[in-house]
Amino acid sequence: MGFSENGKINGIKIILLSNGGNVLDLSGPVMTRALTHLDNCYSFKNFFAKGYICKTNTVSNTAFRGFGGPQGMLAIENILDEISKYLKKPLNDVRAINYYNKKNGLKTPYGQLVKNSKLQKILNEIEKFSNFSSRFREIQTFNEHQIKNGKSLRKGIAMMPAKFGISFNKPSLNQAGALVNVYMDGSIRLNHGGTEMGQGLFIKVAQVVAECFGVTLDKVFLSPTNTSEIPNTSATAASSGSDLNGMAAWNASKVIKNRMEDLVIKLSLIHISEPTRLDGI
């Protein structure tokens, strides 16, 4: 790693090693996400990163939330922290001089353009709203007093930016399916490929369908997730469950709604340019 006196990183090389356990499982995608989050919120003119998955004698475990993202961000944040200590400069100042912006560059190491970044504005507002600077000084004074008096209790405060990728690294996984049935009594049965695990996904997708048909939520009935109904589903992960399954349900609902509108016009004795809807029907 090379950096200037003001803390700007001019070039960096990072090698990641992960404990893959005795079988591969999801170690590959986890490493991919770690590699694509090594930049976090920072632009680097010269950047090289490589990841190795190590086969070990430990039991393999599947991935959980974060999926490599926090590990990648932790690596670069640790590097910036070391630069801050070496130069005796405030960590947030070292971060700020490396942020994605027009001067430093807006393209990630993997070629994606960082558009409409409001990072500096958001951080400034958070710092002001939280009184971060004054609280930092108070804590610093407290810790110095504790050290002076030989006491072990310490306090801490931190503020760290984060850039996290939404959706899957593999494009083919960014898809979903839904099955919508409308019955003679006006009730709607909905199947989709998402998994409800307490995050409220089912109610969100049901709200999408109710909105599309213009009916109240109690008209929509959800069936449990079942791959015999909706095959080839992607995992409910990568902060994509609502977007993918919600849009699949919306598209399916629009197809049926358009058919219903055409049928209303076809069965009418007079020409209707715009069907009149009562309670969404």
What is each stretch, according to the model?
Residues 29-34, 63-93, 98, 167, ...:
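Alpha-helical support elements that line or immediately flank enzyme active sites
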